[in-house]
Amino acid sequence: MHGLKREFRIASRNRISKEIGALMGQGKKEEAEAKKAEVAAGAKRLAELEASETELQEKITKIMMVIPNIIDESVPIGKDDSQNVEIEKFGEPIVPDFEVPYHADILDRLNGLDKESAGRTSGNGFYYLMGDAARIHSAMISYARDFMIDKGFTYCIPPFMIRSSVVNGVMSFAEMEAMMYKIEGEDLYLIGTSEHSMIGKFKGQIVEEKSLPITMTSYSPCFRKEVGSHGIEERGVYRVHQFEKQEMVVLCKPEDSMDWYNKMWSYTVEFFRSLDVPV
């Protein structure tokens, strides 16, 4: 309704402006001045309608952003993580007869982790990965990349910054505020996961059905504020502001989505089993 009123006001203003020109040409100055006052009043009302329309559109967008994705009917419903249902597990964790050191302690013994220097250069939630630890990290990323390429996925290194229109297409405002770092003075955000820029690759595009499915695997550093209940891990490297990972992204027909979900799940399980890691 606001949009219709706005269009009507614009059309009315244009019509009256033409009338003013005609009246001035006829020497009818007083009538022209009255029309000018009418235009001024209309312009004020138009500005009010435009502000109202902007406010209303923002409210509509915020409501739309919290509408969740449609989930498969087989997915169990729960209030939080405590109600997750374990469907299957593979392998048995090895329980040693000694106290298992914390991963950060192991890295310290290997001279592979320097959080103190990172605290000076970047603040809490960052670290330097050094020596063999850094080499193992890079080797694991390469292994994950090649593993997915062998599954037929196309390897991609995406942009590490994306526009707000892409962010709004992949997460809610609340998630964006809790996760994303904004580049000051630019309409750009550092990605929290390469999924965001990979999905953004198809923003505003029409993908022909014959080209589906499109399967991609992407590597990227990831940047996250980690604002919320979990916060930043003080000692370890699990919950930090910067990390790297390999992702899977599939574009397919809606009716094929669950099949592809199961395939991607099986690839994840196979990956961990190839490393003898119980899952």
Segments from the language model and where they lie:
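N-terminal alpha-helical targeting/anchoring segments
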Residues: M1-P93, D108, G112
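TRNA-recognition modules of translation machinery and tRNA-sensing kinases, especially anticodon-binding
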Residues: K89-V279
